[in-house]
């Protein structure tokens, strides 16, 4: 799986978690059942890392969001922002410009 595919699968799961506060293991099982999302160790690591740091990431996002509070940011956008901020702050393997570019690309794909 490419890093982009991992990120896309993680995005869907993080977004689902924002919509439904189900246990993450249940979301993994559902994803496996419908076979639309690949849930491998790489996806799980990214999802769980982002969810573990969600409160801290939201604080950082809030610092840069001068016009909207974190609760007013659409959940679909928040999921993408959390992944991007996580990669920028904690993922040494992803250069900052790549994390930003991937977030913009993902936003453009979902906001067609």
Where are these regions (language model features)?
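Alpha-solenoid HEAT/Armadillo-like helical repeat scaffolds in large eukaryotic proteins
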Residues: 30-31, 106
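Glycine-rich active-site/cofactor-binding loop and its immediate structural neighborhood
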Residues: 84-92, 97-101, 106
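Conserved AdoMet
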Residues: 7, 35-90
């Amino acid at each position: 799986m490419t890093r982009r595919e991992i990120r896309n699968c993680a995005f869907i799961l993080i977004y689902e978690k924002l919509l439904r506060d189900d246990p993450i293991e249940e979301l993994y099982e559902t994803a496996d059942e419908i076979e639309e999302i690949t849930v491998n160790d790489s996806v799980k690591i990214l999802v769980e890392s982002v969810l573990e740091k969600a409160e801290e990431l939201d604080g950082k996002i809030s610092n840069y969001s001068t016009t909207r509070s974190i609760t007013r940011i659409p959940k679909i956008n928040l999921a993408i922002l959390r992944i991007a901020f996580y990669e920028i702050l904690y993922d040494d393997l992803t250069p900052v410009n790549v994390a930003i570019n991937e977030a913009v690309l993902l936003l453009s794909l979902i906001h067609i």
